[in-house]
Amino acid sequence: MKQNKYEIDMCNGTIMDKLISFSLPLMLSGILQLMFNAVDIIVVGRFSGSQALAAVGSTTALINVFTNLFIGISLGANVLAARFYAAGKDREMSDTVHTAVTLALVSGIVMAFVGLIFSRWALELMGTPDDVIGQSALYMKIYFLGMPFFMLYNYGAAILRAVGDTKRPLIFLVISGIVNAVLNLILVIMFHMDVAGVAIATVISQLISCILVLRCLRTSKTSYQLHFGKLRINTVYLKQIFQVGIPAGIQSTVINLSNALLQSSVNSFGSTAMAGYTAANNIFGFLYVAVNSVTQACMSFTSQNYGVHKFKRMDRVLVDCLIISIVTSFSLGCGAYFFGSEILKIYTADPEVIRCGLEILSYTTVPYFLCGIMDLFPGALRGMGHSGVPMILSVIGTVGTRIVWIFGIFPHHRSLAVLFISYPASWMLTIIMQVTCFYFVRRKVHRV
């Protein structure tokens, strides 16, 4: 299997340096994606006021609920493509690529219609205050118009990650990120378009990243080359993509439903707390990118080595990923804790908003390494093709704990601090269940 200069050989050689080489561009890519939203938040917070800031921020959990099922399914495409590519199965690899891209296009169009029709209703269901709901609904509707571009980019990038290429998606996001930032400044500051301006800028930047990743696949002279005339659904491979991807997507969607429920609890404190949570939640996003990039590496490396039956190497991959994840997330979490006030001032100058954001960060940043551990074991299991049970355990541990917390504890001790202690509590419980599940699945693999 001949590899180009962008690809990483996951099945041979040292592991730690290759994991870092794979994870670092992926981490930077995730940071750039978050910066789309961060720039939106910073620009509206600074130039359109706290109500506009709350309007944009209140849509985050809902957008994630709508999109994460399909983004989760892209993990199934990643796992299947990695397995076929490592095994040198060119025809199967090509069919997987064309099935994945077709699925991305269809799901993106569906999500665009869903967002346009149900955005305001969903915001009302969450109890979004009257003073921001109009702007929130406008932002969501424009954002969802770009959903086909968003989906095509993410599925295309999943294919590239499957073959060990995380550098080109990073380059594409650098280009689209610069465009997004420039358009934000032009549309909001010069043309005073407020939330509509930042939404339009995001859609245009997503279109650019979509075009770049599709061009990359189209011009590739490999088994994953894209031919538009071959775009169709292969039901055999679609089923295999769904077997891994749907549980991952359901898990992500349900967890974001719990976050939407938590957003509703934050909404009960008013627009100031909402703005503080918006800024703090954006910081969480940067922390999660660090742990998720290692999880993605673990899944891709595990899948390729599983495809060529290098089971002992899979174990070393998991151990090295745990080391990278814990060190990275703990360091970043401590940084966010100690410099939280300075970071929050980037988003807003309102002292009350900063106070609310600091209260949230105080209970969630230092223990964030637990979130990394919690995600790694399901990532390794998905790499081996097991996705259903990890999904159930994550829903029970994460969502169940937060629901019990929100309805059982929070009403009797109403404060942002009490509300957000539910995060580390849910991470700890889920880790215990996921490690137990991994132990039994891994024993079965040893006997294969």
Residue ranges of predicted features:
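Short alpha-helical transmembrane segments in multi-pass integral membrane proteins
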Residues: M1-S23, A81-G146, M190-I246, T302-P367, ...
